[in-house]
Amino acid sequence: MKKKTYLFALMAMALTLGSCSDNENGIGGETSKYITVSTSIGNMTRVATDEKGGQTFEEGDEISVYAWTGDATVAPETRERVVNNAINKLTNGSWISNPQMLWKNNRDKHYFIGVYPISAISDLSAGEYTFDVNKQTESDLLVAVNKDGLSYNVDEQQTVPLIFTHVMAKLVVNLTYKNQWGTEGPTVDKVAVGNAAKKATVNYLTKVVTPSAVAEDKADFDMPALTANKQYASIIIPQDGVQKITITIGGKDFIYDNGTPFKFESGKITTVNLEVGRDVIKLGDVSISDWGSTGEPIKGEAYD
């Protein structure tokens, strides 16, 4: 999977996935063998951008698709799925499905779940999730749910709208420095998040993420640098148990204690702006925003 660029944009594109006719149920004809799916990713997107600013998935990207009939509000077990983890890969500008997606019949409404990156999920109501700070692309998670449903109609070319949204949270830490560090500023050893949940369960039908409450599933982790010494960012499981961020410079820890735990929310970015002095860190603000908008800052202060 190629590294993605996070953009403040809305991406929409159509993809065609193969299907087969069901003559037994009256769905005949070679012209009726395709399901057209339109996809969009709301607000802050996880896609590539071209020189003109257009947004697309990249060649070779893949999504998992699940489909079922019956109750739209109940995530289906494996044996009840009409489509079970059909991998759709962007190949030469077209989405190729493996295995082919098949209509069950032309009577029942079909409901759909899309997952990016691809994932084989046995329990769609409580899928296991593990965060890996060293695999940011794989740890991000976008989910699309179509609960309106679609029935096959031989006389129409239907599209199945799949609107993907981020279900994980994102943390960004921006660092600035007092002039006592000089014009170039210091070299940061690391920026660490304290006592964060690294495992969770995901309900793919409702997009609800439940972090693990087990102590063994929590740990400190170092944030990847977007710009060394200046900006650090990471995917993080939605949770409300993290209270401290530590900046290490020259072996010395500067600890920001929020006083109360942060609330990292699904589909939102928490941005922490810190000004670092030699003896004290001052908090400029903390903002919480949707991926694609700005939030109101929460004022505060922090010390080493």
Predicted regions and their residues:
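Sec-type signal peptide cleavage vicinity
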Residues: 2-304
